């Protein structure tokens, strides 16, 4: 079968559509925000592919994985196993890094375990194996009359009852063992929990340091080394000494443990720094740790949200000194992962090894180098392998997973991606497109939800969903190549591809007389740069990925403005409009966040029906007792656990999903009850409340930023990052202008926006500037860049080769700068 055939898809706003998607091709699904792109790509095609795979598993396996609901579609033929690479998957695990996610760190651990050269953690000299005589001499240096146990480790932190091991030791004539730190006699009944990890040390001898013990100690030492596989413990009342026949420093008397991959794992007790448990950070909670842990559990916040400092023991490297003392080409594993991907790639490309090490490392280095190359190919060469996953943007984490998938070299798979071009400069976009085509050429079907013009034009096939959003969307408007789409007059995408519609370059640029100076900025990769940020105009900060844009604006400028008194500049406050969720609970929605819900509740409370019943505004909230349905607690659905099947959510049979009780629903405004109003999309509500200025003003701005398709009561945790950002932008714009102006900072507000939505967004941003506010935007979108009054271009590259001011000026001035990638993209637009 050469295509995926979808018949009768009705998920969300899809209107019973049927479409054929060619297999083994790069297919772009596009359309305005809310038109139904994700509903088709993720909630229909991917969801069904995933469900069919899950269904093939045993019921025992399914109880751990959960079976997704069957999408509302009549039939899908030609599906392959599906993998979704979206931006919503954020890993808040503080142990997850770029290196661990891409598996590069696993190969590095193996490499250091096989060819790494151990050094003494104390003096730094290369270590060598100790003979029995050397170990004997070290023990005899203990003070006279020191009592000690000579122990041989026979079981190291392994699960099981270990009955056979204990029986063999008893049969060999030994009397005692130390199990999990406690002395036990071998002639007693020893029963160990099978499911727990245990450590067993054989007591070979008990001695006191004095003259005449050398011969006995030598015999016992040889026995201990034999049973302990070359390792022996000497336990005194004060400390435990470790000796090894394999790796030890003669000068310092320090023995190193076996060099295994686990030694370099900060997730293993064998390698993790004991002070910070492998996190590299210690939480600044001092004597209140237990209280903070209790508060974190009760109030549902992460312990990682607490103040933290670099671990004083490992200095943020996460590992024990023994692991950090193993080196390749004078670098330990922490120093390697702290390099940028690009620098790491160069390090291994120029690594000189002897013939033996080269043979051992050949396959490992091949895997490492291929993964580093894939990261460079998707424009992430500026990241370090030690970078925490939780600090990555949605676009970065998505491209990391994309690079990982290419590394796996799977074929016959259906990949579904959500705007992989987010966060990418035009210069990096070519690398991404080459990567997507490589994934396709491996024999995979690649479906991309995308708005980027370059990606759309590079697609083998385009599916345009629309024409509008919400109820006005959900239909296949056009399908074919970019050229074929551009000829369809009913297609908004076609309008912009053909040039029938376009975002015009402003005829004039605002000039500024005031600015915010930044001097000698040197954080992260910024190289002592000085720049002036204009006030009272629209400034766009540009540059390739990793050039230092976010560092300059979000980590230097924004904190500085928050601390400074801005009154002398006639500025009220500085506001960061980011893509963080607008609500932390499923009960948050667009109406509650913007304050529209308060006005709507007051409106219902003023109706005759409410006055007759004595209802106040609080009666019309599903968050408090009184007006909400108590059967479902105002959720509208009931959760039914199904054990090995996924939890089932059924509509509440009391309120029928309306969230309110019958008495509350009896109160109506213009023929609609409160549940009817909350289910209205913004555009419908705008018409419904046309005569209520307080509500209309807010809804009008939501419409202006392209959110007319979102229902007033839609749960905020279903919003994308771009939608959440535009809700915040609309909220700010709808607020009455104060006596003083504000500074607004935004990071890629065009995320998730179609050409037509970008046009609306630019109009809204220009309205903020027109009323006297300052707007600073970090952006790659050329339509936003060409609309700026002033551009600050960073670069010239990312990571270590970035962090410099390449150019400053108007778009026209920037377009003539020769060493600027942004200039190259602007030349055709600003003539």
Where are these regions (language model features)?
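Conserved phosphate-binding elements of NTP-dependent enzyme cores
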Residues: 1-831
